[in-house]
């Protein structure tokens, strides 16, 4: 059986906004990541579509981490690194994995402190 893991960090960054996003309650203040099995409950997104297709194929699904928030300033380095590190740690714990489905927003920018 194919084992697939799913994750992503999705954010429309506006680099002209001076404040950076951290890990705070969802909304204009920052990210509130969804982790583990809760990721598998997400739908209505690219990630949800990938998971639905994988489920229809009979694959084993593992949720890692998914985070998104409203368009705003850059992602604080500490927030990005925390989410990245959790994705990597959860992926290591889930191994062996055959496929990783990732929903990342191409306009996401990290690089400031919150």
Regions inferred by a protein language model and the residue ranges of each:
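Active-site histidine-anchored catalytic micro-motif
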Residues: 5-12, 18, 26-29, 75-114
């Amino acid at each position: 059986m194919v084992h697939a893991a799913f994750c992503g960090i999705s954010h429309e960054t506006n680099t002209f906004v001076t404040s950076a996003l951290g890990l705070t309650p969802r909304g204009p203040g920052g990210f509130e990541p969804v982790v583990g099995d809760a990721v598998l409950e997400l739908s209505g997104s690219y990630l949800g579509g990938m998971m639905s297709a994988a489920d229809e194929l009979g694959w084993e699904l593992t949720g890692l981490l998914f985070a998104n928030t409203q368009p705003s300033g850059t992602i604080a380095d500490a927030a990005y690194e925390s989410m990245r590190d959790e994705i990597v740690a959860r992926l290591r714990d889930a191994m062996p994995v055959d496929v990783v489905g990732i929903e990342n927003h191409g306009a996401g920018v990290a690089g400031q402190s919150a």
